[in-house]
Amino acid sequence: MGTITIDGRKVEFTDEKNLLTIIRKAGIDIPTLCYHSELSTFGACRLCTVEDDRGRTFASCSEEPRDGMVIYTNTGKLKRYRKLIIELLLAAHCRDCTTCVKSGDCNLQTLAHRFGVTSVRYNNYREQKPIDFSSPSIVRDPNKCILCGNCVRVCNELQGVGALDFAFRGSEAMVMPAFDKEIAKTDCVNCGQCQIFCPTGAISIRHNREAVWEALADPDTRVIAQVAPAVRVAVGGAFGLPKGKSVMGKIVNVLHRMGFDEVYDTAFSADLTIVEESAEFLDRLKNGGKLPLLTSCCPAWVKFVGEQFPDYRENVSTCRSPQGMMSAVTKEYFRNPENSQGKIGRAHV
């Protein structure tokens, strides 16, 4: 245990691993683009740089706290540093912010506004790279990458896949799959974690919004939506509601107003999956099938086992995922002439 003076205020610490954690616990907002407590410390963006009483500057995310330290987090020097860092990042960044899928939710854009970066004094020196649309789950745009390394670390450290890594050095450095392959031709399991950790639009979720709107506009198409359990407690935060609050009723109301004819809860098919997997387990147990039985609820997990542990492929359940099972159930139900009203369109949320 020790005490650090931060901006003139004494703050006690115990077992915090770095200065950044202590500073944030003290209620001081330090900007970062590459730091995540779940990942290893990388120290790439340098936005969390602080100054000590001797005028020395260092990244707080990688600095071990010491008793008696005197730290300043918002001096004039630090403000200039941070503004310059944002400018340099933008100098090597694609600037089509108005049409970017991450516009309004981009950490780099937010920090540029915060530090008053209204223009960039430097020309973009990077050669434009092709956008990778090969994956069914994500879109990778290397022109918007700021080399924070978040996607590389989450793919390696948390997911254990290693589909992305750094290549080349200096001004030529970039993040890419091995041998610059398309992401779909790598060991990527389509988990989407890289997109969650990406602070810009370099990795975004692949969507089919246009197809959904076309289906909703077609009077001859019966459009069905199914909502995953996680969505009901996650979507509310985007509209200012308390995090974790269930908004299933609001979701159903909104989807009906948009034009969806039917809205189903994927939790129902999750129960179906449990029933089917239980039956499969009993069958394997009685008849000497491959054990242990591994769930097939998550397509990313199934692909991960197939790619990383091929010897265990036969251990994975043959059941569909809850979303796949719900889709099959609704398709079979409305295929019946008594229930059918023309074409069927389905949207998974």
What are these language model-derived features?
Residues 14, 136, 146, 189, ...:
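Residue-level recognition of alpha-helix initiation/capping sites
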Residues 159, 198, 334-338:
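Structural motif corresponding to the C-terminal cap of alpha-helices
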Residues 1-4, 347:
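Short structural boundary motif marking the start of a folded domain
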Residues 46-190, 196, 203-222:
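Fe-S ferredoxin-like electron-transfer domains
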Residues 15-68, 74, 78, 206-348:
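Iron-sulfur-associated redox domains of electron-transfer enzymes in respiratory
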Residues 9-15:
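A short N-terminal beta-strand-loop micro-motif at the entrance of redox/enzyme domains
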Residues 6-9, 52-54:
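Short strand-turn-strand beta-turns centered on an Asx-Gly dipeptide
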